[in-house]
């Protein structure tokens, strides 16, 4: 029998597939089969949104079309029969017309690296197809499933807000004041100074949204749905069979025939299990358009919903129902809605089904606890007939008597209405407020006897605290008949803690936090019910006090908004001079249309091979044997490369290409599998058998490294003044320490490379996503034993880097190049997200120990600090990180007597490397923690102590570099004024006095960020500029475009210097073929150094062409170029900048390592929930000295994006390792970077007026890194709020600071009667699931 055809449409074009592989997902099909590369691979698990596309389905029963976003990485193509798929390429392009979403995303400066942009565009596009004038709530909800690492989200919101009603207005729903004009407490915003800045974009330029111009749903698909008789479709391959029944009878028959086969609707549960856990299902049953699975039946008793309805459809249905029915009947519906608003992202909610969510019974399911306490029932069907079972705790535990039978199908779910005197509540706490699995969640229900406040029924279930949803049935039974009072609450907490238990080594860790949440949620429920009883019987039940009422309010954001104050262009500047103007990122349009080409978007090369790595599963072990035989026998496998193949080219410094006889970390490269397809290479890698023998010692933490004296080199040290003598005169001395956790780069584009042998003279071309093409060129040449001039490295753009695409990228490129050279064929290597996070180290975990002497007035007179960074298993950049940390640790403060020492620790973790800020975010936090503790001891505010100790005039740093701190202090004063510090600090105190369970905090942090690379050689740069006879110019330089807009700025430089329109200047990318011997792009100096080289090349050309131009001053560049050609005058010039004068002598502890300093200050105000540890950034004000901004739009983007990345570092980004050194957090489901829900509700960014710096490019300053540190203003604002909570509870003295300040750490620091109730495990009595490193 011939297999059925798969018929669907993509971007209006018909697609027919006769031989469908059921294991094929839509993402690789679009990218490889249809060459639609605008849809990106970001994580492969539906967690980042980079692969978002829109699916449209026609319903012949309702004659309606449903448009919804999905994650293409989790969408099997077999599920697409009869659908229309729209990708970013299908809505607009540069060749025809742009869609308004694409235009506005680009012109509102909403792209940086651009890798996430197509996903953002498609999420917004899908929203507009359903809601042409969305509300702000709908907008933020639609983008909740999309991650961006570069922008900080604010410009994305700005772009999308232009489609909202009244451009995002809330219609005065909040305090009667427009959301766009709100300031503090609804007053008119930001009145101080009222400086005006030119708009970064003009809405008048935007084309209007015209829904009539969208792609129509294919009429053919409508006809098929209307007229074609329904028939089960079966798609199969050698490994898998996909069955798509189209009637309920066929579905029941298929389930009877294949009882072990899972029924999937959205593939959001089965898909990740298949991809990440290696689960394989030979048969999958996927119902398609079965009406009975989508029923909506509302009666007086409740609601019956089809099991096939998507979670987003359920959300819409419940939203409609709660608006129509009395509140007392909709308790369960409202609780479900509360969780549906934060459950996953819009894409997953549109894919996942209600039935799938229930039957999967995941331990952290948000809906199942609520459905269970709500007495829901499940309607089942099999060949034996219909059956109804309760959705009970026994069902969730998969007890045989209460479970589905293998042949049964879940058809629908009955959700009863709540009754009078019945209350249902939902609770959850996650690492991030939205699109994050719950750490603990709960559903709770109570029914009282009529009017008496005496418990008649009680049901409490928890998720996240066991292998499945766990109930407190016995506790509830014992509480029946008890009155609803504090005595009952106290008893309930103790009973529940005794019944719902967690072992100290429970999977997921956070055991004490989870125990605390169990009873914190119970307390919240107690208060919510009291509030409900008050509504039902106001005369009998008193109102909650303000102190208690604060426990009930969730930390929801208001609508996001911002103000920007940047620099005006001088009125004397020529209109055509682009310097200082907010020019759009020149790849912005291509980002938004999907036309921007990244490394893995490059077309396949003839006979291309694919490489994947086998990595170590042990942290410190001897390799006993490697068995390749089984893997080599698999079809399509071409070769497996080990260290033996590389001969003597195995080690570069402390970095090893492939492990030889030992492995030193989990994730170390052991061998590389080469096959004719990516799938076959990955399958074969699983069959490589490596036998290990563990070695001692296993060193994972800094403390263990100190114990074993495991350091890479001897200490680095800087000292000024006489520290020991100064301690003798100090009024007080304190000692403390702070641990700062690591951070994953989480660039959206994973490590990617394509190596192409040229077939002549051993030449080889490397197309790679890197910051340092020269380094790759050198290592590949050494590995292949070629001269460097035969190895060329090309980089068009990089989808984010942040320091993470240097060292390990070069290692992987060398191995890939070896494979390509050996086989004479192109080899492609692209890491999956989990591989990338496992192999490549991130920011260094850090430990700072300080001893500080100070006077009673807050003056710090002596400081002795030890810095330790966890370098991992090889040196990489660790020594430089420690050196930069020591050089920059003073931040904004003059410490007259200072000793700082640092060590890079060797451990058995993947080598940590550079990450935006390069040691300063850690070292600066150590200093600020010390200053904060001094303030507490002195009874002063931290801001007072900061002001007292700050550099203020011309001064010397602790390494004897002179600088002027006038601008630093100006930033500080300006920030204190603009943020209305005094008034708001008073308001925070008033709020805290009135609220026991919510607390607010404020912190203002200064910034002095040194910019420089430490030596002249590392700061040199070159450029090449050609002028063609048509008057156009081509510029090449050594910098890498990775989102910061360096190419845009270089074209601005050429335009100014040559007085040539920017439209006449082009830049193709970066290549060692055009500009050799480049330095790495990083350290905030890429535009500085390369811009000066480009400027030099332009000035060389102008000097050369000056006689020609002076003879024809009214001519055009076309005229001048032709004349130059006729006169044999070269139209090409090399520009060169030798580097800033930089030096540091570590033996003497002095030097001039930095060219200039970036100054700034940030004030953040936060609110915390003392019962859950949740926090919300209410407002952030940032003031920056940027010199003279070359492009304010790009510079604001750098400051804002860096701040949000820093905020993530200090609050929610938490790496988790096992005690054996295995990284648990290998993707966005386990590792949380900030999402839209995390950004400040208000954000105000101000640039100081231009200041002159003669040595830099047009007096500009590099801003790529400095803003990261300002994110710690949120950290210290949280600290301030926690301290207020502790003071109110009578807890004095400091508490141990660690970063990040996650919900767990915040909650456990807010000690109260609930934290005292929980059982504690004795240290050493158990093996923890995870450890801090």
UniProtKB/Swiss-Prot annotation:
<dbReference type="GO" id="GO:0042803">
    <property type="term" value="F:protein homodimerization activity"/>
</dbReference>
<feature type="domain" description="2Fe-2S ferredoxin-type">
    <location>
        <begin position="4"/>
        <end position="91"/>
    </location>
</feature>
<dbReference type="GO" id="GO:0051287">
    <property type="term" value="F:NAD binding"/>
</dbReference>
<dbReference type="InterPro" id="IPR012675">
    <property type="entry name" value="Beta-grasp_dom_sf"/>
</dbReference>
<feature type="active site" description="Proton acceptor; for azaheterocycle hydroxylase activity">
    <location>
        <position position="1265"/>
    </location>
</feature>
<dbReference type="InterPro" id="IPR036010">
    <property type="entry name" value="2Fe-2S_ferredoxin-like_sf"/>
</dbReference>
<feature type="binding site">
    <location>
        <position position="1198"/>
    </location>
    <ligand>
        <name>Mo-molybdopterin</name>
    </ligand>
</feature>
<dbReference type="GO" id="GO:0006629">
    <property type="term" value="P:lipid metabolic process"/>
</dbReference>
<dbReference type="InterPro" id="IPR036856">
    <property type="entry name" value="Ald_Oxase/Xan_DH_a/b_sf"/>
</dbReference>
<keyword id="KW-0963">Cytoplasm</keyword>
<feature type="binding site">
    <location>
        <position position="1042"/>
    </location>
    <ligand>
        <name>Mo-molybdopterin</name>
    </ligand>
</feature>
<feature type="binding site">
    <location>
        <position position="357"/>
    </location>
    <ligand>
        <name>FAD</name>
    </ligand>
</feature>
<keyword id="KW-0479">Metal-binding</keyword>
<keyword id="KW-0411">Iron-sulfur</keyword>
<feature type="domain" description="FAD-binding PCMH-type">
    <location>
        <begin position="235"/>
        <end position="420"/>
    </location>
</feature>
<feature type="binding site">
    <location>
        <position position="113"/>
    </location>
    <ligand>
        <name>[2Fe-2S] cluster 2</name>
    </ligand>
</feature>
<comment type="subunit">
    <text>Homodimer.</text>
</comment>
<comment type="similarity">
    <text>Belongs to the xanthine dehydrogenase family.</text>
</comment>
<dbReference type="InterPro" id="IPR037165">
    <property type="entry name" value="AldOxase/xan_DH_Mopterin-bd_sf"/>
</dbReference>
<dbReference type="GO" id="GO:0005506">
    <property type="term" value="F:iron ion binding"/>
</dbReference>
<dbReference type="GO" id="GO:0043546">
    <property type="term" value="F:molybdopterin cofactor binding"/>
</dbReference>
<keyword id="KW-0560">Oxidoreductase</keyword>
<dbReference type="InterPro" id="IPR000674">
    <property type="entry name" value="Ald_Oxase/Xan_DH_a/b"/>
</dbReference>
<dbReference type="InterPro" id="IPR016208">
    <property type="entry name" value="Ald_Oxase/xanthine_DH-like"/>
</dbReference>
<keyword id="KW-0285">Flavoprotein</keyword>
<keyword id="KW-0408">Iron</keyword>
<dbReference type="Pfam" id="PF20256">
    <property type="entry name" value="MoCoBD_2"/>
</dbReference>
<dbReference type="InterPro" id="IPR016166">
    <property type="entry name" value="FAD-bd_PCMH"/>
</dbReference>
<dbReference type="InterPro" id="IPR046867">
    <property type="entry name" value="AldOxase/xan_DH_MoCoBD2"/>
</dbReference>
<comment type="function">
    <text>Oxidase with broad substrate specificity, oxidizing aromatic azaheterocycles, such as N1-methylnicotinamide, N-methylphthalazinium and phthalazine, as well as aldehydes, such as benzaldehyde, retinal, pyridoxal, and vanillin. Plays a role in the metabolism of xenobiotics and drugs containing aromatic azaheterocyclic substituents. Participates in the bioactivation of prodrugs such as famciclovir, catalyzing the oxidation step from 6-deoxypenciclovir to penciclovir, which is a potent antiviral agent. Is probably involved in the regulation of reactive oxygen species homeostasis.</text>
</comment>
<dbReference type="Pfam" id="PF01315">
    <property type="entry name" value="Ald_Xan_dh_C"/>
</dbReference>
<feature type="binding site">
    <location>
        <begin position="263"/>
        <end position="270"/>
    </location>
    <ligand>
        <name>FAD</name>
    </ligand>
</feature>
<dbReference type="InterPro" id="IPR022407">
    <property type="entry name" value="OxRdtase_Mopterin_BS"/>
</dbReference>
<protein>
    <recommendedName>
        <fullName>Aldehyde oxidase 1</fullName>
        <ecNumber>1.2.3.1</ecNumber>
        <ecNumber>1.17.3.-</ecNumber>
    </recommendedName>
</protein>
<dbReference type="Pfam" id="PF01799">
    <property type="entry name" value="Fer2_2"/>
</dbReference>
<feature type="binding site">
    <location>
        <position position="344"/>
    </location>
    <ligand>
        <name>FAD</name>
    </ligand>
</feature>
<feature type="binding site">
    <location>
        <begin position="801"/>
        <end position="802"/>
    </location>
    <ligand>
        <name>Mo-molybdopterin</name>
    </ligand>
</feature>
<feature type="binding site">
    <location>
        <position position="73"/>
    </location>
    <ligand>
        <name>[2Fe-2S] cluster 1</name>
    </ligand>
</feature>
<keyword id="KW-0500">Molybdenum</keyword>
<feature type="binding site">
    <location>
        <position position="51"/>
    </location>
    <ligand>
        <name>[2Fe-2S] cluster 1</name>
    </ligand>
</feature>
<dbReference type="GO" id="GO:0006805">
    <property type="term" value="P:xenobiotic metabolic process"/>
</dbReference>
<feature type="binding site">
    <location>
        <position position="353"/>
    </location>
    <ligand>
        <name>FAD</name>
    </ligand>
</feature>
